[in-house]
Amino acid sequence: MTVDVLVARSDELDLASNTSDTTINATVVKDETIITRPPPTLTRSWSLPNASTRRTDNPAPPVLTRASSLPVKLVEPATDIDSDSSSVWTWAWSDEMQGPATSKRCGTRWIARLLPFFMLMLVGYATYDVVVYCCVEYFIQEIRKTATAIVLIVFYTIFFILMVAAYIRCYVTIQFNTGFVPWTAAREAAESERNERSTNGGDVESLQWSPADTNPDSPGLEAFYSKDVFICESDGLPKWCSECRSWKPDRAHHSSEYGRCVYKMDHVCPWMGGIISETSFNFFIQFTFYCACYCVLIVSTNAYVVTLRRNAGQSVEGRVVVGLALGSLFGLFSIAMTVTALRFVFQNITNVDLFRKNQTFRLAVRVPTGTRSTDQFTTITYPLSPPGDDSRAPGTAHSNGVDQSDGAGSIATNRMAARDQRAKRTFAILQTQSGENPWHVGYRNNFKSVMGETIFEWFLPLRHSPCTRHDSMVSDYEFGPLVEELKRRYGLAEEDAEKGANETTSS
């Protein structure tokens, strides 16, 4: 049996006590053989201050963090830290897609494959219509308006290049970095079993639903309570996806089209061949914007040709009418999509949020340890106790599957208990009112969180959105002033100030 073991040096326990998912190195223990796992393809990482100020000549043994209920083996990280460099901690949230993302529906797959060729034919006809006929044959050769033709060709080339670049960037991102929430080992095992049953003609639907994991050391749970704020259910636990068999990160939604949870999913776009999510939303906006500009240029050019020919008493050719009609149709569609997408950006919502505009959110907000439930709100303290273990002292870790008779196991258990005592966190469960958006951080910041910090990122498909980083120790996505408003609404702001004043007085 295989189990992931996360280890950290005791001289870096100050950070590991809060985020024990962050480690210097990750290993896999299998049949007493230690295998170093290669770094994931995509990671969220951050740097710590210079480690030399916290190094000692005799470092303490490694400290085991909570990973699973299975017997584990302590492993010293192989990577050492130079005294003059900062250590890089990696949070293992990676997109493990090895190939293109494919829909579960045959019709969607074929549409996604054929539409790019259809768009290529449309662009080819538009190029012939605007460049060859309108600019070369009519403006230059027939009516001798060379300057007008050159200006139109230049603008056409600019919009064409920008549109194609944004489309390719968006399409490739959707196929190879869709924004899927990584599967847990349990979900991968279930998928293998499902595929095996499907091959053997068995019942595959019986594997679709799975209840929430009640294990206090459930894989991925610590990633939530290591933050200060996260979206939760009424019991204080994160949302659970029964199909993916994993905890759902903030703003993640399950796509029945692909059978996966997706970070900040917006919609399935057949023109782009997949799901528009946080990894591709900014490129999608850039494409629709440049496509709108491209279509406006096509319509304007053809309309100008129609006007000149009618004023000269000449008939209007059919190819000009076709270009005018196609440009108008796709231009209106592109403009509508651009306006709608920009509205979502400025409001910091998605298409999914729009259809749930009256929804309410429950937020687990970190409060001072020891805060008790009231008539207005309930609290929950992490790490959780094992089911039925009411005798356990607050903040004391259970054995986590380590044999108490073994000396190394007892030492590991004591270290875990000490770690849990320091890592103990209490959260108040606060509920928003209908229609309130906890992620609204102001129109300017909303825009920058998706489109980027610089004007080059706004107009060129260079980088992914800043909101894809998830490297904040406060929350997965930046919360707005509504969190502080909720604290005041539930009387927690005064309580925090009171406890802070008492601590200052006692010190």
Curated annotation (Swiss-Prot):
It is found in: Membrane. It comes from the Eukaryota. It catalyses: L-cysteinyl-[protein] + hexadecanoyl-CoA = S-hexadecanoyl-L-cysteinyl-[protein] + CoA. Residues 239-289 form the DHHC domain. Keywords: Acyltransferase, Lipoprotein, Membrane, Palmitate, Transferase, Transmembrane, Transmembrane helix. Pfam families: DHHC. Its EC number is 2.3.1.225. The DHHC domain is required for palmitoyltransferase activity. Belongs to the DHHC palmitoyltransferase family. PFA5 subfamily. This is Palmitoyltransferase PFA5. The lineage of its organism: Eukaryota, Fungi, Dikarya, Ascomycota, Pezizomycotina. The gene is PFA5.
